[in-house]
Amino acid sequence: MGKEDKTHINVVVIGHVDSGKSTTTGHLIYKCGGIDKRTIEKFEKEAAELGKGSFKYAWVLDKLKAERERGITIDIALWKFETPKYYVTVIDAPGHRDFIKNMITGTSQADCAILIIAAGTGEFEAGISKDGQTREHALLAYTLGVKQLIVAINKMDTTKWSEARFNEIIKETSNFIKKVGYNPKTVAFVPISGFNGDNMLEASTNCPWYKGWEKEVKGGKATGKTLLEAIDSIEPPKRPTDKPLRLPLQDVYKIGGIGTVPVGRIETGILKPGMVVTFAPSNVTTEVKSVEMHHEQLAEGVPGDNVGFNVKNVSVKEIRRGNVAGDSKNDPPMGAASFDAQVIVLNHPGQVGAGYAPVLDCHTAHIACKFSELLQKIDRRTGKAVEESPKFIKSGDAAIVKMVPSKPMCVEAFTEYPPLGRFAVRDMRQTVAVGVIKKVEKAAAGSGKVTKSAAKAGKK
């Protein structure tokens, strides 16, 4: 297959902190990945010097993580690996303290979640206990529209590759993911050792009893033996190129001799030079002079592309991180006066009532919003209302809440523009709730700034 023919997909790796996520992810990136041999050799040498030889795959990931946390410049190719069918990007390094926030504000939408479960005695039980991280992560993935799941049952070597233990874990995990919302029949369960490499890329000889995984897919069944094959059997995503443009800004740079360059990831639609874009909620309209990615000019940017684009006659003071760019002629973005959202309270020590005003992280925006009204309490499993106008909600509850941003922000309904329709509620330095936006009351549009070049381009 030619390099260009492969589809890009995003996976998110979830599971308990000691399940071996780093080692498993590191192994895939290491064996099929974007890390060049020189870097690997350098890492291995350092690991050996520090007596961490046994930890090499996780060590690779730790090095990458450290570099990523130091600055944004880390080559994102390092988080990629290739399968026969796909280019895979690992969206978040597991164990990252911002994992939940990242999942929701989602630098990108995952196409599939890989749940890593440790098979060791006691380890498995700890991972999916009632207060386990695993439950929270899986629930989060499902709520945020990650509908495909792979379960990798790791550290099988610690159970001496016991078939009975494997089957017991499948049974327990099936019940567990069913409660979250997944259908176990559509899930591949793969017994692996992320450290030794069993069933990662090649079928292991340590489990002669293992006949392979099987899952239901549209129009039939998929089967395979390894984790790599399970990743290859992910159904390819439909990318939202046909929707109107939405591009949340991550940063706005001023570049000498070029001018103002907003940077961000295209979530929906297409961005082309010559287009007239509107930034919300700043309400500034201008022409796009050029679009580039990785220092190369693009004829057009599509969803998933992280682009910089040059705009005319707009100063860096007028637009900022958290603004959203869209096509001025095709459902241009607008600020929100208020919005209704389905909110799930994850961990709040007290109870939440009307008037609560935490910070919301939605796409790249970070803005305080008031819970102005609790409309209904909802049964999380069925989505049906169980109480009208509740006074309070507490941890574990789901509710429809009317929210009012403290200053202008641009959000959308999750059904129309998913990446702009989900958010994390942050308070006391943690994620206390997550939400999905049901409907948006747009702010009355005042007359905004329209640059000369936009007016001219608009007449063309």
Curated annotation (Swiss-Prot):
Region ranges (G1): 15-22
Region of interest (G4), residue spans: 154-157
N6,N6-dimethyllysine: residues carrying this PTM: 3, 317
Binding site for GTP: 15-22, 92-96, 154-157
tr-type G domain mapped to chain residues: 6-241
Gene Ontology CC: cytoplasm
Alphabetized PROSITE patterns for the sequence: G_TR_1 (PS00301), G_TR_2 (PS51722)
Segments for region (G3): 92-95
Residue numbers bearing the N6,N6,N6-trimethyllysine modification: 80
Subcellular location: Cytoplasm
KW Transferase (keyword) present: no
Region G5, residue ranges: 193-195
Region (G2) location: 71-75
Keyword Nucleotide-binding: yes
Main location: cytoplasm
SUPFAM superfamilies on file: EF-Tu/eEF-1alpha/eIF2-gamma C-terminal domain, P-loop containing nucleoside triphosphate hydrolases, Translation proteins
One protein family per Pfam: GTP-eEF1A_C
InterPro entries linked to this entry: EFTu-like_2, G_TR_CS, GTP-eEF1A_C, P-loop_NTPase, T_Tr_GTP-bd_dom, TRAFAC_GTPase_members, Transl_B-barrel_sf, Transl_elong_EF1A/Init_IF2_C
Highest rank taxon of the organism: Eukaryota
Keywords, comma-separated and alphabetical: Cytoplasm, Elongation factor, GTP-binding, Methylation, Nucleotide-binding, Protein biosynthesis
Modified residues (N6-methyllysine): 3, 31, 317, 391
NCBIfam families: EF-1_alpha, PRK12317.1
Function: This protein promotes the GTP-dependent binding of aminoacyl-tRNA to the A-site of ribosomes during protein biosynthesis.
Protein name: Elongation factor 1-alpha
Name of the coding gene: TEF
